[in-house]
């Protein structure tokens, strides 16, 4: 079934809000698009509409986290990263355990245009100290990531990257900081080709791997990276040793 990762956020954060009464949600007037508005329906006393004021939203989230609240704030990825200096000072350097949710990432939103596309968000967030980056590929994986963020005592800011487009819902395990092999064949001495993938493009990557398989059966491996920072160095090094091509 085709589902968007942002739908997982909208459906599951309110459920986790039932379990943890310190979870609060901040919206910058895009709640219907980011799906954070669904939190308001179940927990109106823990939902705060900040308006079109992302810088204020980030500052408020830092203050709330100081008092023990687990804050989820949401906007388009392109709009959040436009407040780079506020993220840098109010969250990154101060290691505030806030979850920033950036939706509508990548080019898949199409006709909305480049001003709405989160194209540079990963490079921007990776450049900042102490920020961890999560980029789930499927609806089910996004559910697992949201559960991890809610259940774990975070010690730094996290950036959760979500897509608008529906993608194939592939079942796979999730472990923070680890890459996962999602397609492999019977290799004698490792695969000929290993393809790295992250985020909503995974289904397309697997389709491409199957096309290669038609020419060289069972010689292509796909590894999914739901965590971009910290990256799983071990599986990258292992793949470089085992594969002819990356």
Model region roles, listed by residue range:
Residues 1-161, 166-167, 178, ...:
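Thiamine diphosphate
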